[in-house]
Amino acid sequence: CEGIRTIAAQGFAMSDVVSVGITYQMHGLVCLDKQGRPLRPSIIWCDSRAVEIGAEALEGIGREFCLAHTLNSPGNFTASKLAWVRRNEPGVFAQIYKFMLPGDYIAYRLSGRMSTSVSGLSEQILWDFEEERRADFVAGWYGIPQEMIPEAGVSIGTEARTDEAAERLLGIPAGTPISYRAGDQPNNAFSLNVMEAGEVAATGGTSGVVYGVTDKRQADPQSRVNTFVHVNHTASNPRYGILLCINGTGIMNSWIRRNVTQETLDYAEMNRQAASVPAGSEGLSVVPFGNGAERMLCNRCPRAGIIGLDLNRHTTAHILRATQEGIAYSFRYGIDIMRGLGVRPDVIRAGAANLFLSPLFRQTLSTLTGARIELFNTDGALGAARGAALGAGYYKTRGEAFAALRRLEVVEPAEADRETLEEGYRAWVREVEKRME
């Protein structure tokens, strides 16, 4: 609400809004009563409380059956979080009328209609990829009544319209189509026009993500990466997103800024100082895993750490570089898993935002993975806006929607640094494995 009011205060007329697009952090749980009131604070994506519940469900439902139908372990995802509420907060669970994702809740507040999307069901581990329908067997295992699950529609297309309450609150005309809805990572891929099999998107915010589109139903037997329904999926033209999520990436960089630099440096200056140190950070290494259980490490949490600090050699600049290298190492670790499943990220597209604003990070990631990195003039907000316009018919084709998308920069691997970074990566892997023993 505050953001929309800020836009209106800058002279933009809300009457000019022709459609609404919504993007949100994936996997969060919102529980509503019959009056549409939240019953408890949302349990967000990186909250690890449901890990054991998800592991129990995988074995109880049957590992082979579960992976064949949902392509994922129930893990720490939304359905498992709701099962945690049922087990630990029965009074709250008894009052739930509908549960939904954070983006679904925003759509509800704007429209008065409780709904979700097929892509949303898949990120909750409530979609049966084999049967192309809701995975009621997961809900049944958890004791979740089917009537608690909202009706599901498409991601790109009008599934709801704003109501009079939203018009009174925000000024957006009642009846405006809500014509796009996607979790932050499918939306990031959409914002980069990553829609076809073989295309790969990445982002480096609080968490780091690599998202590869495929037309094949694929599951990682260890659930280190996950498969979800992409925004342009249909039964006749299947599109799935294989998602690598690393919880501890940008949040590590921001922690260093707060606690090491005491916020005396902005990110641009941090990047400049980091670049003054040679590749490999002269033996200093950073493990960034301190933001909850890591899926790519089989839901283990080795914690964050600064390794090999030499008080006579290393400076703040070394810590800054080692942090970005450690984050890039974590991307490399996950991308190797994706390659084992047939995803070949020879080209990685990213928006000019977050960690990808750092020339050092871009170059290090390219060198470690051997991939060409392409930087574009887009972000998640532009993606949701384009999706809304496409879904409402303002744009008639995808080509029209992305006509203004421009490639800003291409980064190729730096062969001169490859051997040093490979040596640093191998030492980093040994440290991570030691922490998981």
Task: Write out the residue ranges for each language-model feature.
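Residues that line or immediately flank small-molecule/substrate-binding pockets and catalytic motifs
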Residues: Y24, C46, I156, N232, ...
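Active-site phosphate-binding/coordination module
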Residues: A8-L82
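Short linear loop/turn motifs
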Residues: P150-T158, M270-Q273
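Short beta-strand to alpha-helix junction loop
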Residues: D128-E131, S155-E159
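Active-site core segments that coordinate phosphate-bearing ligands/cofactors
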Residues: M14, V51, L58-R113, G120, ...
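Short, glycine/charge-rich flexible loops or terminal/linker lids adjacent to PRPP-binding catalytic cores
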Residues: D47, A160-A165
